[in-house]
Design a protein with these regions (language model features):
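Intrinsically disordered, low-complexity segments enriched in small/flexible residues
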Residues: 1-107, 113-118
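Glycine-rich anion/phosphate-binding loops
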Residues: 85-86, 119-134
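A generic structural signal for short coil/turn motifs at secondary-structure boundaries
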Residues: 117-121, 154-155
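Conserved catalytic cores of soluble enzyme domains
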Residues: 147-233
Length: 233
């Protein structure tokens, strides 16, 4: 019996260490170069935006271990490092609970992470977004969303049956929240395509001076034969 406990404790310790390691990979401390790049532009990281938005230790994250649906062409360890959270942080938090009280402070927080595949919208990314908006509708909670990112992502090759992503419910879900859940969107940097749709269909829209917002990014415009443009044009 003692040997059994020792063996299983050893396995549990290993699994727990792996669990903690996975958690650490999604933090800024594990993305030093990406964090430096953000700060050089004068921007915050997604985690820093979340920290400034929510009350200390109030954020309950959903889907932190998600990675891009690209396992058939990229190593899983690489995906854990390079595509943490699949580019979007979602969860529950409170905002200004000391001022308004815990019940009135409950909020859904959604932050696009531009350091992960330019904040593009992938397969599991959309599933996370759909899940958290369903929770917002269920509990009638306000949403604060940071929408920086480049729209739909073409490289999620693990999904064999999806055509242009037009079968996803994300945008109809977002529209259905109107009149039920307050939606506050913040844009900074590049915000194109699906990201811009979420921004434009929010109740309150806040954009920094360094924002470039459009329903089509440079790649889509060029692909449509309309010419080559810089994203800031």
């Amino acid at each position: 019996y003692s040997a059994f406990l020792i063996e299983n404790n050893s396995k549990m310790n290993k699994e727990f260490k792996n669990f903690l390691s996975r958690l650490e990979k999604s933090k800024d401390s594990s993305k030093i170069e990406a964090t430096k790049k953000r700060h050089k532009l004068g921007y915050r990281t997604a985690r820093e935006n979340l920290e400034h938005l929510s009350d200390p230790d109030s954020f309950l994250e959903f889907g932190e271990f998600a990675v891009a649906a690209q396992r058939s062409r990229r190593d899983y360890e690489e995906l854990q490092k390079e595509t943490t959270t699949d580019g979007i942080i979602t969860g529950f938090c409170t905002i200004n609970a000391k001022e308004v009280g815990e019940n009135k402070a409950n909020t859904i927080g959604i932050v696009y992470d531009y350091s992960v595949l330019a904040g593009t919208q992938g397969f599991f990314h959309h599933q996370k977004l759909d899940r958290i908006t369903e929770q917002a509708e269920k509990f009638k909670l306000p949403i604060v969303i940071f929408t920086e990112g480049g729209g739909g992502r073409p490289g999620d090759v693990d999904v064999m049956t999806q055509i242009a992503g037009l079968n996803i419910p994300t945008f109809s879900n977002w529209a259905r929240l109107s009149g039920n859940c307050l939606k506050i969107a913040i844009a900074n940097g590049y915000c194109f395509a699906g990201n811009a749709a979420l921004f434009g269909c929010s109740d309150f829209r806040i954009a920094t001076k360094n924002s470039w917002i459009g329903m089509a990014g440079p790649a889509m415009i060029e692909g449509g034969g309309l010419g080559v443009f810089d994203p800031k044009e």
